[in-house]
Amino acid sequence: MAHEVKGEILGMLGEFKKFIARGNVLDLAVGVIIGGAFGKIVTSLTESVIMPVVGWLTGGVDFTRYFVRLGPVPADFKGDPTSYAELKAAGVPMIGYGDFITQAVNFVIVAFIIFLIVKAVNRMFEKPEEAPAAPSGPTEVELLAEIRDALKAKG
């Protein structure tokens, strides 16, 4: 019985080794790491460039300050009662819809950039359309029909 379990474990380890050795798993790992780094770049772009411009265009609106408080502020709270970050740190239950707007903009930017990347990759690997083949002449059936008609005409 112990010998069978050992054999199963060794078999599973062999399968796992084959699975890991395939390029797909390594490609996925690289993609996850690059995706994490790319996400940080997009977050920085959104928070440091895009949202301040949107705030400026909307009259100085700071979207991080848009929230709804759901519970009371603790009596010993000494921070800014209009600061989402400070209230959140104090444990006040809130809905931060301004932060949600920022994250939604992040998502749209990431989705659009991924769309552009996929479109460019697809264009690179796109096979050029082959020109339609020139007609190669009559088919076998058409030739036989011509021969038949010629024989009928002769008599």
Swiss-Prot record:
Where are the bilayer-spanning segments?
25-45, 98-118
User: Pfam families, from UniProt?
Assistant: MscL (PF01741)
GO cellular-component term (any): plasma membrane
Where does the UniProt annotation locate this protein? Cell inner membrane
Q: Which residues form a coiled coil?
A: none
For this protein, the record's SUPFAM superfamilies field holds: Gated mechanosensitive channel
List the InterPro entries: Mechanosensitive_channel_CS, MS_channel, MSC/AndL, MscL_channel
> What are the alphabetically sorted keywords of the record?
Cell inner membrane, Cell membrane, Ion channel, Ion transport, Membrane, Transmembrane, Transmembrane helix, Transport
Check the UniProt entry and state the signal peptide residues, or none: none
The GO terms this record gives for MF are:
mechanosensitive monoatomic ion channel activity
Bilayer disposition of the protein: Multi-pass membrane protein
Return the PANTHER family for the record.
Answer: LARGE-CONDUCTANCE MECHANOSENSITIVE CHANNEL (PTHR30266:SF2), MECHANOSENSITIVE CHANNEL MSCL (PTHR30266)
Q: Which HAMAP family match?
A: MscL
Q: Which family does it belong to?
A: Belongs to the MscL family.
Q: Enumerate the NCBIfam families for this protein.
A: mscL (TIGR00220), PRK00567.1-4 (NF001843), PRK13952.1 (NF010557)
Describe its function.
Channel that opens in response to stretch forces in the membrane lipid bilayer. May participate in the regulation of osmotic pressure changes within the cell.
Quaternary structure, from the entry: Homopentamer.
Q: What is this protein called?
A: Large-conductance mechanosensitive channel
Recorded source organism is: Novosphingobium aromaticivorans (strain ATCC 700278 / DSM 12444 / CCUG 56034 / CIP 105152 / NBRC 16084 / F199)
Phylogenetic placement of the source organism = Bacteria, Pseudomonadati, Pseudomonadota, Alphaproteobacteria, Sphingomonadales
